UniProtKB/Swiss-Prot annotation:
It comes from Paracidovorax citrulli (strain AAC00-1). This is Serine--tRNA ligase. Keywords: Aminoacyl-tRNA synthetase, ATP-binding, Cytoplasm, Ligase, Nucleotide-binding, Protein biosynthesis. Belongs to the class-II aminoacyl-tRNA synthetase family. Type-1 seryl-tRNA synthetase subfamily. It comes from the Bacteria.
């Protein structure tokens, strides 16, 4: 959530920055905001006047009583002021709630270094990497896609449809082993080499957790709501609503909700391997073949909670942590700086890592690393105690390290051999019993 003080100080500048984001989108109901702000200022001024008058009269009451004089008239006026103050306080509370409702629908302000653009065509390539130089080396034979390569190895889309519907996949045998090996390898890299603490988290979270990281209320349609037994047809109170996690960013970042962290404990680095559940609303007809876009997929998530002065240094660092996995696996990729029109709701700046897929002859997203600055922390009331002893909002960052399913797709396509078999990347062989070919 944006700092309301920033909007009060320079609304025009904030609106100009917001308008560089994806359109059409109602970022802020400006007229409603200005009307509420005007009423708030008037009420606050009146409230301060009433409080000052009440204090003066209360002093008079004490003086009159000390002299043995009648104070009934003055006390009656104090009583009248009390009622007006209570009414003002109630209306101020209502205004603050209405302002909050407006602000939770507003995305983060793009950082000044973010390229301006209306959609993904405005994204800027930062660098690319390949084991053979910058560009991927041709396979030397016609590339099969991951579906044709994976089905003989245990990738079963028909069973996924039978069990759950479209955009679900079953993995068996060699493919299941490869999937598990990838997740374990990613966790080992992030915990042993990059200092993240491995966490096991619930796959079901409450509405407060999703509000804290920004998925609610704006993106409820992208979530899977969970119902307890016997809840069918019964209204569920907001504070009892439960959802399947769309990413472990949600539980990990919420570790610091309503907390004041000692500055000496920053940065906090957390990682978790979890399934992620997304309805993929608005993605109908896109990536219908294979594993690229699923309702359920696994991801190793990285989260950092940092000092505000060091969050952009942490963004570069985390991007490198995701790149390290791709480099160890020998997978060609490029790093893209997302433009203002392609960034996520809570991000101030985002890098996407895109892996090379030979069968598609293109790069596809495999990781997204974002600095949310204080946007989530303000919702979460996640703070640290600074050197002066004052509480200050932390900055939060999150990123994939990596999406396991898409990494599996990339391994199948980049390590395919002319006979249709798939070689095992050297880094994964210890996790697969030393096998050099997936079998």
């Amino acid at each position: 959530m944006l700092d309301i003080l920033l909007l009060r100080k320079d609304l025009d500048s904030a609106i100009a920055r917001l308008e560089t984001r994806k359109k059409p989108q109602a970022f802020l109901q400006v007229e409603a905001f200005q009307s509420l702000e005007s009423e708030r200022k008037t009420l606050q001024t009146r409230t301060e006047e009433l409080q000052s008058r009440r204090n003066q009269l209360s002093k008079q009451v004490g003086q009159l009583k000390a002299r043995g004089e009648n104070a009934d008239a003055v006390m009656a006026e104090v009583g009248g002021l009390k009622a007006e103050l209570e009414n003002s306080a109630a209306r101020l509370e209502q205004i603050q709630a209405e302002l909050h409702t407006l602000l939770v629908a507003v995305p983060n302000l793009p950082h000044e270094s973010v390229p301006v653009g209306s959609d993904e065509s405005g994204n800027v390539e930062v660098r690319r990497w390949s084991p053979d130089g910058q560009d991927p080396k041709p396979l030397g034979f016609p590339a099969k896609d991951h579906v044709d390569l994976g089905e003989p190895l245990g990738l079963d889309f028909d069973m996924g449809v039978k069990l759950s519907g479209s955009r679900f996949t079953v993995m068996k045998g060699p493919i299941a082993r490869l999937h598990r090996a990838l997740a374990q390898f990613m966790l080992d890299v992030q915990t042993r080499e990059h200092g993240y603490t491995e966490c096991y988290v619930p796959y079901v979270v409450n509405a407060d957790s999703l509000r804290g990281t920004g998925q609610l209320p704006k993106f409820e349609g992208d979530l899977f709501a969970a119902k307890k037994g016997g809840q069918d047809g019964e209204p569920v109170p907001d504070n009892a609503a439960l959802y399947l996690i769309p990413t472990s960013e949600v539980p990990l970042t919420n570790f610091v909700r309503d907390q004041v962290v000692p500055e000496s404990e920053l940065p906090i680095r957390l990682t978790a391997h979890t399934p992620c559940f997304r309805s993929e609303a608005g993605s109908y007809g896109r990536d219908t073949r294979g594993m690229i876009r699923q309702h359920q997929f696994d991801k190793v998530e990285m989260v950092q909670i940092t000092h505000p002065d060091r969050s952009y240094e942490a963004l570069e660092e985390m991007t490198g942590h995701a790149e390290a996995v791709l480099q160890k696996l020998g997978l060609p990729y490029r790093v893209m700086s997302l433009c203002t029109g392609d960034m996520g709701f809570g991000a101030a700046k985002t890098y996407d890592l895109e892996v090379w897929l030979p069968a598609q002859n293109t790069y596809r997203e495999i990781s997204s690393v974002s600095n949310c600055e204080a946007f989530q922390a303000r919702r979460l009331q996640a703070r640290f105690k600074n050197a002066q002893g004052k509480n200050e909002l932390v900055h939060t960052l999150n990123g994939s390290g990596l999406a396991v399913g898409r990494t599996l797709v990339a391994v199948l396509e980049n390590y395919q051999q002319a006979d249709g078999s798939v070689a095992v990347p050297e880094a994964l062989r210890p996790y697969l019993g030393g096998d050099s070919v997936l079998r």
